[in-house]
């Protein structure tokens, strides 16, 4: 018989989804003494933290002049949110009911009520499902040229972009600043981009457009080395040397939980008030890529998380729904991050801790628990 789900008290604010938007919203809400509850999510990205968890190196996030590993950046932002009192549930939200107040959120183990909600579930980059795609994701394959194109691994190397729209053309042009040459793989005989953008790409001597070309697979050893393609005009298979492959075939917003509950655009992105985080339902806010089909950057997501938290705080206060916590200390204790962890051993090992360090903890967790594991090698 399945365990009965726990019914919790009504929360001030629940944040669904992690990543820069969710964690930043949590920082601001926690510092406002709202003690937000953040449901990190696993299903869409496979691990909490959003798309930056699959980015090897981030060089365009303010405050890191020498760059920072994507997982390390998310670890730091998460630690800051927890330090100020954010409560974490490392599960997926299975269903959300916005038809009555307080709102109802169901996870695999809990039934949660909340007076307000911030949605930061993000958008997932569309993939092609190639045989070796997973093996080379973040090892040559990326879904964001602006995020990753300038990293050392791609400099002065042959690069490729898949897609034929404006985004694909923009990324191909952008990559010519860093790569030795860019191959644009287009399935049809014509670009779908605007005429001006198409003209610029076709006139660029550093870009080769491969018309009617289908990407079949990616090949390499530890890092991507070449692309296996099929030319439709000859029906022949061919190989293209490339150390980097960038997908520009669109994103799918993770909004299935809100179907017929909140207004979306034709692509499924949540609609908000212009320049603001309010959705079509009072007390519900959107932050990050779930409502952003254009910019999709870590720093813009973080900024939108800040706005969503401030708006939620004001709304809760205005409607006298906020129950503020009282802190024992004005300044909370220092945050624990992966860099401050002590190495786990037989005496201090705790299987319930989110972060562990060392081979002892890895062996114990691998053999004795069913938890999904995420490894960071330092």
Predicted regions located by residue number:
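Residue-level detector of alpha-helix initiation sites
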Residues: 19-20, 123-125, 166-167, 292
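Proteins that catalyze or organize thiol-disulfide redox chemistry
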Residues: 338-378
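Conserved N-terminal Rossmann-fold NAD(P)-binding element of oxidoreductases
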Residues: 16-17, 160-163
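FAD-site-proximal beta/loop scaffold in flavoenzymes
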Residues: 2-10, 129, 135-153, 248-300, ...
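A Rossmann-like FAD-binding core segment of flavoenzymes
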Residues: 81-100, 105, 112-113, 176-274, ...
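Beta1-alpha1 glycine-rich phosphate/pyrophosphate-binding loop at the start
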Residues: 5, 11-84, 169-195, 265
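Glycine/small-residue-rich loop that forms an oxyanion/phosphate-binding "nest" at active or ligand-binding sites
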Residues: 88-150
């Amino acid at each position: 018989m399945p365990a009965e789900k726990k019914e919790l008290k009504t929360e001030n604010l629940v944040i669904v989804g992690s990543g820069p938007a969710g964690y930043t919203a949590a920082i601001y809400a926690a510092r406002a003494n709202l003690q937000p509850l953040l449901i990190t999510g696993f299903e869409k990205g496979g691990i909490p933290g959003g798309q930056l968890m699959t980015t090897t190196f981030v060089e365009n996030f303010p405050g890191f002049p020498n760059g920072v590993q994507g997982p390390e950046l998310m670890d730091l932002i998460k630690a800051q949110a927890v330090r100020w009192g954010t409560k974490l549930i490392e599960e997926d939200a299975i269903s959300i009911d916005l038809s009555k107040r307080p709102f109802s959120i169901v996870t695999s183990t809990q039934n949660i009520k909340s007076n307000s909600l911030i949605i930061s579930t993000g958008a997932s980059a569309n993939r092609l499902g190639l045989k070796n795609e997973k093996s080379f994701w973040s090892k040559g394959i990326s879904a964001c040229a602006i995020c990753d194109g300038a990293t050392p691994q791609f400099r002065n190397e042959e690069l490729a972009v898949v897609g034929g729209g404006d985004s694909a053309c923009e990324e191909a042009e952008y990559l010519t600043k860093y790569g030795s040459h860019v191959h644009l793989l287009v399935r049809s005989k014509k670009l779908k981009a605007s005429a001006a953008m198409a003209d610029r790409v076709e006139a660029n001597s550093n870009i080769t457009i491969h018309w009617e070309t289908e990407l079949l697979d990616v090949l390499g050893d530890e890092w991507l080395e070449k692309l296996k393609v099929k030319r439709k005009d000859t029906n022949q298979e061919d190989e293209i040397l490339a150390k980097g492959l960038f997908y520009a075939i669109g994103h799918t917003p993770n909004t299935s939980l809100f179907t017929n509950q909140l207004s979306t655009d034709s692509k499924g992105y949540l609609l908000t008030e212009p320049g603001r985080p309010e959705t079509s339902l009072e007390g519900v806010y959107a932050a990050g890529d779930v409502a952003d089909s254009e910019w999709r950057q870590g720093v813009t997501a973080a900024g939108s998380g800040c706005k969503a938290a401030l708006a939620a705080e004001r709304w809760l206060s205005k409607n006298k729904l906020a129950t503020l916590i009282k802190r024992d200390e004005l300044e909370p204790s220092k945050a624990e991050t992966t860099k401050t962890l002590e190495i786990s051993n037989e005496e201090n090992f705790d299987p319930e801790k989110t972060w562990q360090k060392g081979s002892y903890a890895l062996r114990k967790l691998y053999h004795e628990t069913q938890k999904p594991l995420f490894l960071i090698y330092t």
